[in-house]
């Protein structure tokens, strides 16, 4: 029997400069759905450019809690999280408080 696939919290950079966070157990399939316009309503109106980050979680419930936490954060905290993941240079970091969804 195959082990269950981990769930991922992911963050997309959209064409309008905004971020979109979501969860999936198949990141490539979900990103392609966003690109085709068959993903979330938000990404239909604001098409994604790239996946900025993703983090695996053991199950959907844990990934959903992390997604909720991330979506509660202001843009500055999201940028801090991206910098902590090594996806933005240190000078782009707006504050010293890393976001650690769990």
From Swiss-Prot:
**GIY-YIG domain mapped to chain residues:** 5-80
- Mention any Pfam family matching this sequence: GIY-YIG
Query: InterPro entries under this entry?
Result: GIY-YIG_endonuc (IPR000305), GIY-YIG_endonuc_sf (IPR035901), UPF0213_domain (IPR050190)
Q: Which family does it belong to?
A: Belongs to the UPF0213 family.
Which PANTHER family does the annotation name? UPF0213 PROTEIN YHBQ (PTHR34477:SF1)
Protein name in UniProt: UPF0213 protein XCC3072
Native organism: Xanthomonas campestris pv. campestris (strain ATCC 33913 / DSM 3586 / NCPPB 528 / LMG 568 / P 25)
Taxonomic path: Bacteria, Pseudomonadati, Pseudomonadota, Gammaproteobacteria, Lysobacterales
């Amino acid at each position: 029997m195959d082990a269950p696939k981990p769930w991922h919290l992911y963050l997309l950079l959209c064409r309008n400069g905004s971020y979109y966070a979501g969860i999936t157990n198949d990141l490539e399939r979900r990103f392609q759905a966003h690109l085709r316009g068959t993903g979330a309503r938000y990404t239909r109106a604001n098409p994604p450019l790239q996946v900025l980050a993703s983090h695996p979680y053991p199950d959907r419930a844990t990934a959903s809690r992390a997604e909720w936490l991330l979506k509660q954060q202001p843009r500055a905290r999201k940028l801090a999280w991206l910098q902590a993941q090594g996806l933005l240079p240190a000078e782009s970091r707006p504050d010293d408080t890393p976001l650690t969804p769990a």
